[in-house]
Amino acid sequence: MRSVNFDPDAWEDFLFWLAADRKTARRITRLIGEIQRDPFSGIGKPEPLQGELSGYWSRRIDDEHRLVYRAGDDEVTMLKARYHY
């Protein structure tokens, strides 16, 4: 299973959700678990990003917010967990 690292902004986003909306924080935790197992398929409609964020992927947290991450063989780095790209 891949290890998970948070960019400082992504960690702040996650802490925001823990304080503001526990249901969304649980959804993010579930998405991260899925990403650890299979970063390119599963819940949240994973899609590769283009342009500046080429090489990153996103999954839907809800209609407004996305979880943006980059997956390697041994680790996953979370870039954002709030707003749209």
Swiss-Prot record:
Native source species: Mycobacterium tuberculosis (strain ATCC 25618 / H37Rv)
Protein name, UniProt field: Toxin RelK
Coiled coil regions, renumbered to chain: none
Traits of the deletion mutant: No visible phenotype in culture or upon infection of mice. Significantly fewer persister cells are generated following exposure to gentamicin, levofloxacin and isoniazid.
Biological process according to GO: negative regulation of DNA-templated transcription; RNA catabolic process
UniProt keyword annotations, A-Z: DNA-binding, Endonuclease, Hydrolase, Nuclease, Repressor, Toxin-antitoxin system, Transcription, Transcription regulation
Subunit and interaction comment: Forms a toxin-antitoxin complex with RelJ, perhaps RelJ(2)-RelK, in which the toxin is probably inactive. Also interacts with antitoxins RelB and RelF in vitro, in M.smegmatis coexpression with non-cognate antitoxin RelB increases the toxicity of RelK while little change is seen in the RelFK pair.
Role description: Toxic component of a type II toxin-antitoxin (TA) system. Has RNase activity and preferentially cleaves at the 3'-end of purine ribonucleotides. Overexpression in M.tuberculosis or M.smegmatis inhibits colony formation in a bacteriostatic rather than bacteriocidal fashion. Its toxic effect is neutralized by coexpression with antitoxin RelJ (shown only for M.smegmatis). Overexpression also increases the number of rifampcin-tolerant persister cells. In combination with RelJ represses its own promoter. Several DNA-protein complexes are formed in vitro depending on the RelJ:RelK ratio.
Catalytic residue list: E47, H84
EC number: 3.1.-.-
Origin organism lineage: Bacteria, Bacillati, Actinomycetota, Actinomycetes, Mycobacteriales
Highest taxon in the source lineage: Bacteria
GO molecular function terms listed in the Swiss-Prot or TrEMBL record: DNA binding; endonuclease activity
Induction of the gene: Expressed in log phase cells. Induced by treatment with rifampicin and gentamicin as well as by nitrosative and oxidative stress. Expressed in human macrophages 110 hours after infection. Induced in the lungs of mice infected for 4 weeks. A member of the relJK operon.
Family of this protein: Belongs to the YoeB family.
Family matches, as PANTHER family: TOXIN YOEB (PTHR38039:SF1)
Family annotation (Gene3D superfamilies): RelE-like
Pfam families noted in UniProt: YoeB_toxin
